[in-house]
Curated annotation (Swiss-Prot):
Keywords: Protein biosynthesis, Transferase. The gene is fmt. Pfam families: Formyl_trans_C (PF02911), Formyl_trans_N (PF00551). This is Methionyl-tRNA formyltransferase. Attaches a formyl group to the free amino group of methionyl-tRNA(fMet). The formyl group appears to play a dual role in the initiator identity of N-formylmethionyl-tRNA by promoting its recognition by IF2 and preventing the misappropriation of this tRNA by the elongation apparatus. It comes from Nocardioides sp. (strain ATCC BAA-499 / JS614). (6S)-5,6,7,8-tetrahydrofolate binds at S109, A110, L111, P112. It is an enzyme of class 2 (transferase). It comes from the Bacteria.
Length: 316
C-alpha cells in the first residue's frame, strides 16, 4: 500500500522505522511544524521530521491538518492508508476521508481503557498490572474508532512512564505493520470497541504532579513513576520547588514514626513520611540546579530529621 505516516515525538520513531522497512511504500511523513526549544528558543524540527529526512522521505509540516493546501498535498499523494503515532493535532473529517483505508492510530493502551492524551501515565498511576497498545481507525470521537489489533504488556513494579512507553513503542511497531499487512490483504477487519470498560486519560499537568505526602506510600510511588520523566513529580522545600525521581518503600521499622512530609535524614539516604509508611527519596533536582542524590541534597541544604516538606500542599 501507499502510506503516509503521521507522528511528531521520539516515541513515534520505532513505528516510522518499521513502516519504512516494511513492504509498504512510504511516500511521505506528516509532522508538526518546527517549534522553539532550549534556552535560545531556536526553531527545531520534530524528532520524526529529522528521522524522515535521514530516511529520504518527503516531510509535510502543516500548521493545521484542516488547511486546504495540506489536504490538497495529501490528496495528490494518493495514500491507501495513513498510520499515526502521537501526531499531536486533531484531524478534520475532510482529511480523514482522503486515504482509502482511513487513518490508523497506534494508541498506547488496551482500548477502550485509557482513551486520551496520557494513557501510559494514567495506567501506572492507577496501579494497573497490565496495559497494552491498540491499532484503530480514527473517527471523530476521541480514541473511539473500531480496533484492528492489540498487544499487551505487563507493568513492572519499577516502571516509569518513560520506561513503559519505550517498550510499548517497540512492540507497537510490529503491531502497526501487521495491521497494515492485514488491511492490504483483506484478512483484518476493524471491530467496534466494547461499550464496557471505557476510561479516560487526560493530559497530566504540572500541578497534577505535586505530591501530597498525606497520601499512602503506594499512591505516591505510583504518582512519581507516572510523572517520570514528564511533567516530573515535585514538592516544595522552604518555598522552593524540588523535583523528585522515583522513590522506594521503606519498611515500617525504617519509617521512624515520621509524619506526612517529615524528613528522616541519614548519612546515605533521606526518608519522607507519608499517610502510611515512609518512602526513600532517590535522585532529586532542586530549583535551578542539576539532579543529585537525595542525601547529597539534604547535606548541602543542611536539612535535619524533623523538617517538613510540602505537607498537604502547604508547608508547616
Amino acid at each position: 500500500m501507499r502510506v503516509v505516516f503521521a507522528g511528531t515525538p521520539e516515541v513515534a520513531i520505532p513505528v516510522l522505522d518499521a513502516v519504512a522497512a516494511s513492504s509498504h511504500e512510504l511516500v511521505a511523513v506528516v509532522t508538526r511544524p518546527d517549534a522553539p526549544a532550549g534556552r535560545g528558543r531556536r526553531l527545531l524540527a520534530s524528532p520524526v521530521a529529522l528521522r524522515a529526512e535521514e530516511l529520504g522521505v518527503p516531510v509535510l509540516k502543516p500548521a493545521h491538518p484542516k488547511d486546504p493546501e495540506f489536504q490538497e498535498q495529501l490528496r495528490a499523494l494518493r495514500p491507501d492508508c495513513c498510520p499515526v503515532v502521537a501526531y499531536g493535532a486533531l484531524l478534520p473529517q475532510a482529511a480523514l476521508d482522503i486515504p482509502v483505508h482511513g487513518w490508523v492510530n497506534l494508541h498506547f493502551s488496551a482500548l477502550p481503557a485509557w482513551r486520551g492524551a496520557a494513557p501510559v501515565q494514567h495506567a501506572i498511576w492507577a496501579g494497573d498490572e497490565v496495559t497494552g497498545a491498540t491499532t484503530f481507525r480514527i473517527v471523530k470521537e476521541l480514541d473511539a474508532g473500531p480496533t484492528y489489533g492489540v498487544m499487551t504488556e505487563r507493568i513492572r513494579p519499577t516502571d516509569t512512564a518513560g520506561d513503559l512507553l519505550a517498550r510499548l513503542a517497540e512492540g507497537g511497531a510490529g503491531l502497526m505493520v501487521a495491521t497494515l499487512d492485514g488491511i492490504e490483504d483483506g484478512s483484518l477487519e476493524a471491530r467496534p470497541q466494547q461499550a464496557e470498560g471505557v476510561s479516560y486519560a487526560p493530559k497530566v499537568e504540572v500541578e497534577d504532579a505535586r505530591v501530597d505526602w498525606s497520601r499512602p506510600a503506594v499512591v505516591i510511588d505510583h504518582q512519581v513513576r507516572a510523572c517520570t520523566p514528564a511533567p516530573g513529580a515535585w514538592t516544595t522545600v522552604a518555598g522552593e520547588r524540588l523535583k523528585l525521581g522515583p522513590v522506594t518503600h521503606a519498611d515500617a521499622h525504617g519509617s521512624q514514626g515520621l509524619g506526612p512530609g517529615e524528613l528522616g535524614v541519614g548519612k546515605h539516604d533521606v526518608l519522607v513520611g507519608t499517610g502510611t509508611t515512609a518512602v526513600r527519596l532517590g535522585d532529586v533536582r532542586p530549583h535551578g540546579r542539576k539532579q543529585m542524590a537525595a542525601a547529597d541534597w539534604a547535606r548541602g541544604a543542611r536539612l535535619q530529621t524533623g523538617v517538613r516538606i510540602g505537607v498537604a500542599f502547604g508547608e508547616s
